[in-house]
């Protein structure tokens, strides 16, 4: 069963958040390329929710060293003032209109 990791991050400023998002775009495929889906949502001027889906807990655990490194970088370089995450089994998924989703960044 696929699992989701939902990370919440609160930044000191909107500029810090944007810089962190730009940094994440440059490393996502190399550091977290085994994620099945990644969706980042700006939930406020200085807050971000990141949803990453993995095929299993074991698959997600392979990213733990890079996840820690990423968290350390964003806390030091991009002034994250708070960060926490949840994880759990995905119990429902529907994506029939996934092709219609538009984003600020293109992969």
Map each language-model feature to its residues.
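Short S/T/G/P-rich N-terminal loop/turn motif that feeds into the first structured element of a domain
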Residues: 1-49, 55-69, 76-107
């Amino acid at each position: 069963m696929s699992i989701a990791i939902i990370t919440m991050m609160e930044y000191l400023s909107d500029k810090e958040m944007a810089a962190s998002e730009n940094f994440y775009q440059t490393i996502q495929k190399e550091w977290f390329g085994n994620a099945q889906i990644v969706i980042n949502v700006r939930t406020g001027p200085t807050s971000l929710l990141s949803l990453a889906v993995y095929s299993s807990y074991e698959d997600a655990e392979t990213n733990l060293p890079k996840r820690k490194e990423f968290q350390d970088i964003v806390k030091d370089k991009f002034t994250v003032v708070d960060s926490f995450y949840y994880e759990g089994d995905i119990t429902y998924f529907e994506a029939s209109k996934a092709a219609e989703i538009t984003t600020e960044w293109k992969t």
